[in-house]
């Protein structure tokens, strides 16, 4: 999960749909100076139109007088990543992502983008679920909700420990029911340097460890980071 304070909602959309340099976060351009679309992605939206996500989020923010300050969290990015051995399709990944969003981000404007691969051809298909922090429609009260504002219309999404625990358990249960490989999301893991992991993948395509999760987090954080220091702050 990544909480984003940038008011430029279109930045996430552009990063998810167009090729970017993984180190700098800058878009790759063709000979005519145009951004290059990512290949093989699948995209969808909930409670909004994908192409007008940014404008619709700002409209909701203005309606409920939210997200006016620079320190306000504007959006949330949740990532579901799968083992290459699962051979899960983009459509199946989208189905799981939409179920997750419907359960844990109910009432929010959400865009979902499925990336068929990670860096260096690692093959780990993954879903980016980006939600406006302000809830456009009311949600049903769930067992992990601790306060009314966690499901009330016009209030902001709270990524609480209770919500994260329920979300992790849901993902593990879904993977288990579908016969997919999974990791214990409740087990502490040592995360080493991101680029060490990338070099390992370059030397050996089968190099897969727990650090793969960190690689996905960095991939999601890059469009929101303005500097390496800011990137470190987001990941922290």
What is the meaning of each model-derived region?
Residues 1-236:
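N-terminal nicking endonuclease/strand-transfer module with a His-rich metal-binding environment
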